Structures are given as structure tokens and as C-alpha cells.
Amino acid sequence: MRFTSFRPFAGITLNIVIIVLVTVGAGALAVAADLPAVTKAPPPDSGRLWVEFDYLAWTVKGDKLPPLVTTSPPGTPQVQAGVLGAPGASVLFGDSTVNDEWRSGLRARMGYWFDSRRRIGIEGSFFGLEQASTEFNAGSAGTPILARPFFDALANQQSAALSAFPGLVAGSVNINETSRFLGADALYRQQIGSWGSEHFSVLIGYRYLHSSDKLGIATTATVTLVGGGVPVGTTFNVSDSFNATSNFHGLDLGIIGEFTQGPWLLEWRAKVALGANFNEAQINGSTTTISGGATATLPGGLLALSSNAGSYSQTRFAVVPEIALKVGYQFAPGWRIMGGYDLIYWTGVQRTGNLIDTTVNPNLLPPSTGLGGPQRPQFQFNRHRSWPRVSALA
């Protein structure tokens, strides 16, 4: 809901917002809905302080993940089970974009006019969306087959780690990714020209944006094969985690134009924020073995090994331009309804999907032998770009 006070009138606003984020890593394509309530203008002798609250309903095209879980038909040979490209193999989770569903949020905006004619003022806003989450959970006593695919850097071919296979192992795969998105600004506004029903103002201030993703992969595999060299009942718990965060801080510059004709209002806004993205990434993995009542934990999972595990940071120049257009209609004294579009372009956002390297040197799997081979998986801040969009209705 939005409650706004201003002169000469206030009202319901219908905003259609499109936000485009150019990302480092997988993209974030968002579609948003801003659903404010009818608002009424203050009387002529009211104060200069104004406050508004918005309910947001956004959908974000989230993180692009590589294939993470596979299966194969019954009767598939063990060496082909879950292997990408093998006959009958299919992807159960991954090779897709996650966290692109509708989610709710709130935005608060406050401002103050320094003069009674409302030509000079300040304003600030904050928005936050609820956390988006995607889960995958699968368990099997052996059938169906469950596997985690990877590319074997030593054999130079596709391979898979089995969590469930008939007569060999029984287990499960559990994956969860969460995503958050929020932002704020603080602006100084001053009118620079007024010609009849047309008014132009400039903006200068500070802008902040935050994007974060957390991906956790947990697998279990319990040995069911008798005489295979590993005691029956031995359980392997393998964990990989990937976290990515981007924080933008920048100088926001812009101009606003307003045109009124009878009950109609047209407002456009063009801004650009120049600053820096502070990108951070954390990769961790572990393998716990439970056998005969004894438990041992070693560093390294499957896709998070000694070659890429750790904490990383990066600072890069970033640009956040924005173009907005709103149309309003005063349908009663002191009331109006509005609709519009907003386009934001954010460069350099890091996502977890592009932190994942699916090429693995088996010699680095715990217990690591260190017998040579490439340092894979490897870490890198991915520089691919995408076009996240946000649409809004109110």
C-alpha cells in the first residue's frame, strides 16, 4: 500500500517497472508489481514532509545453474549411470534458471520540501523483496538411479558420482538455493526550470543495491554392495556450498520532467548511478564418512575442493542507469491514479551459478592423493552478462 502526501494532488499510482541487471554470472531477470493504494493530497497548510509505502510483487529471472543431478533408466550399466550424453541419461535438477517466480516485497519512501512551492527538497527510499527459494529433494534405495554429473579432467570425458544405484548404494540428493534483492537511495532534488505546465528538476545523491545467492548441495550414499571392499552400511555425506554477493555503491545523477494538462499528468525520470560493485564469493565443501560407529570428516566435497574452496572478493566499476515514465489522471479533487514504466540496467552482478566449475580432477576428491593433474574445479569471477527485467503493476 502507498500513502503519499504532496501538492497539488496525490493519488493511486500504477507503476510498471522493468529492471535490467547486467550480471557477472547468471542473470537476474525480474518482473515486478508495485501495488499502492489510493492517496490523498494534503490541505494547503499541511507540512512539507511526505511519506509513502508500496507493496511489491516481483518476479526475478534468477540464477542459471549447470546440470547438478541426473538419472538413467533401469538396467543402465554402472559406468554409464547418470553420465551426461550417455544413452537414456537425463537431468533431474539444474541446466535451468531458478528463483524466477513471483515474490512479495515492500518499499518505503520519504521526502521533505524546503520551500512552500516545492522546488527544493530531499527524498530517500528503501525496498526489499522476500527471500526466493528453490529446493530439490530426492531419495532412492537404488532404483531410480541418482547421480551427480561432472567432467573428469584426467580421463577427459563425462562421469558421475552415484548416490543411488541398484545393488551398490542407496542415498539422497538435497539442493537448496536462496536469493535476495534490495536497494536504497538518498537524493537531493531542485527545480531548474518551469514553463507554464512544464517543470524540470535535477537529482543528485547516493544509490545502493544488493544481490545475494546461496546454494547448498548435500548428498548421502550408503553402501549396499556385499564384498565390494567397503563395509556394507558405510555412509558418505558430501556437501558443497556456493555463496555470491554483490553490493553496489554509487553517485546517482538525474533529471525529472513533469507536464500537466487538465486532470492529466505526465512525468519522466532519467538517472544514472556511477560507482563500484563489491563482489564476494565463498566456496566450501566437506565429506563425512560414517563406518562401524566411527566418523571422519575431510575438507572437500565434489564440486568444492581444495582447488577452488575459499573466500574471494573483487571490486569493479559499475553503472546503473534508469529511465522511468509515469502517466497520472486526477479523477477527484486531491486524488489521482498513475501508471508507468521503469527501466534499470545494473552491470557486474555476481551469481552463484557461474561460480560452479563442473570439471573435476578425481585426484583432488577426499581423501586427496595429490598425485597430479589439473587444479580443477577452479575459481573465477565470471564476467558473462545477462538482462534481468522487472515489471510492476499497481
Which sequence ranges carry the predicted segments?
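Outer-membrane beta-barrel biogenesis signature
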Residues: 30-52, 60, 64-72, 190-193
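Residues on the lipid-exposed face of transmembrane beta-strands in outer-membrane beta-barrel proteins
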Residues: 53, 108-112, 124, 186-190, ...
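Outer-membrane beta-barrel proteins
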Residues: 35-42, 111-116, 189-195, 257-263, ...
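Extracellular/periplasm-exposed beta-strand and loop segments of Gram-negative cell-envelope proteins
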Residues: 64-73, 77-101, 131-180, 210-247, ...
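Outer-membrane beta-barrel "beta-signal"
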Residues: 50, 57, 384-394
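Outer-envelope beta-barrel architecture signal
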Residues: 47-49, 106, 118-120, 196-202, ...
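Cleavable N-terminal export/targeting peptides
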Residues: 1-42
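Transmembrane beta-strands of outer-membrane beta-barrel pores
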Residues: 57-61, 126-132, 208-212, 272-280, ...
